[in-house]
Amino acid sequence: VMTGGADVMPGIHATLGRMRRFTEAVQSGAWTGQSGKPIKTVVNIGIGGSDLGPRFVAGALSGFHHPALRVRFVSNVDGADLWSALQECDPETTLFLVASKTFTTAETMANARSARAWLVDALGTEDAVQRHFAALSTNIAAAGEFGIATDNVFPFSDWVGGRFSVWSAI
């Protein structure tokens, strides 16, 4: 597939490979939170195409879900949405996926900052962000400024439109 005269497939395949390895590590328990406990809950924080596509896919494939993992979705800027999701979460075993093309979407970033504060408050260290947050974004630098390790950022191209983002790292 060519875009702007460049073959984009090598980059897409590299990201898909990294996503597979990360997913397998979470599912197997090899990826752990700050305290060394395996992840049990994954919370997707996004809005629009960064929420609807993943939510649809999770629902459609729910019969094939990993039995040790729960998935929650937070998209409403009303704090009650995040609060409701966090009631079922243990900070030591929760992984947040911040899904934002630009990593500046107001609603998504408000929820991400609140989730980050909840996590850091509970675990007592900013270092926990690197083990409990991943980003799906075109803006690797902003995700890094948020505290997300570069290896935990799964990029996609800025030409991917929101309604089509389900076919990307989102």
Kindly label every feature range from the protein language model:
Residues 1-34:
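Extended, charge-enriched "interface" segments that sit outside catalytic cores
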Residues 24-29, 36-170:
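Glycine-rich phosphate-binding loops that contact phosphosugars or nucleotide phosphates
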